Amino acid sequence: MLHGHSPVSQALLGTFFTWGLTAAGAALVFVFSSGQRRILDGSLGFAAGVMLAASYWSLLAPAVEMAMSSGGFGSLAFLPVAIGFTLGAAFVYVADLLMPHWGAAEDPQTALALNLDPLLTKKSDAEGARMLFPESELSIRIGRAGLLSDKSENGEAYQRKRAVATDLAEGPAAPGPPRGSAAQPGGSSWRRIALLILAITIHNIPEGLAVGVGFGAVGKTASATFESARNLALGIGIQNFPEGLAVSLPLRGAGFSTWRAFWYGQLSGMVEPLAGVFGAFAVVLAEPILPYALAFAAGAMVYVIMDDIIPEAQISGNGKLASWASILGFVVMMSLDVGLG
């Protein structure tokens, strides 16, 4: 993130920075035990506030300004922003719904790890999800779909982790799928691993895309500045820090070695540079789509915050701490955007 470089180079540097903070967060597994949820929940709340502020000042505000200054929409200048924002949220939502149908109904990082670790796969078969992943370790952000494919009566593709935790607490662990089924490693294990990697990729596209679009928009309007894009990358990096820990800490508690838990924790941030470069290329080559692209990235980010990060921070009894941490994060990011932008 240096002045004087192309938007694509800036996006690459920015997303390497966000990936690095994901890895730094995952590395806290070497320091914290799996029982220290207050630290994780407070960090997730802070990250949610930071990203809400960054989504507005670094993405939505420039998108609105571009739509208004183009002159082609008149009183309907809100339309491209509303369309892009809705499509961004819908992208993440539809990806969530499609994952079980693609055979990736398990949570991506954990399921991928189990596919590559036969000993833990046997442990999962023998003890069930309740023993391998205790109720206190059930984490939404590890993946939106649970370890168990939990169909709900109202037609939803799956239930949230909170519902899974309640079910496990009230009744015996559900039996694992039979041998030879799609949920077991075997002849189709490489296909399943590829699907799980795809799931991880889709779930982390919004962060990288937001950074790339932010740098690609620099100079297009008064509010789309280098400082604004830099602050956006900083905000996403702050968000990714506890996300890395939210993956590595439960894996460590599940019996993975510290190094393996760290590896899978940082894995989610690895795809962000690719999404960032794509976003920067897209808006540089097709400038008219900028308002849509900025709003799309904002919609995807806000959906992830509301659907994943905030609920996860609330499930372990630390809701008040997480809420006040969110307020603090919003104020800090707002101050950075206004003061340094």
Swiss-Prot record:
GO molecular function: copper ion transmembrane transporter activity; zinc ion transmembrane transporter activity
Keywords of this entry: Cell membrane, Cytoplasm, Golgi apparatus, Ion transport, Membrane, Nucleus, Transmembrane, Transmembrane helix, Transport, Zinc, Zinc transport
Transmembrane segments annotated in the record for this chain: 12-32, 44-64, 72-92, 193-213, 262-284, 289-306, 321-341
Protein's membrane topology: Multi-pass membrane protein
One GO cellular component term: nucleus
Catalysed conversion reaction: Zn(2+)(in) = Zn(2+)(out); Cu(2+)(in) = Cu(2+)(out)
Biological processes, Gene Ontology terms: zinc ion transmembrane transport
Localization: Cell membrane; Nucleus; Cytoplasm; Golgi apparatus
Signal peptide positions on this chain: none
Domain of life: Eukaryota
Physiological role: Zinc importer that regulates cytosolic zinc concentrations either via zinc influx from the extracellular compartment or efflux from intracellular organelles such as Golgi apparatus. May transport copper ions as well. The transport mechanism remains to be elucidated.
Family that this chain belongs to: Belongs to the ZIP transporter (TC 2.A.5) family.
Name the UniProt record assigns to this protein: Zinc transporter ZIP11
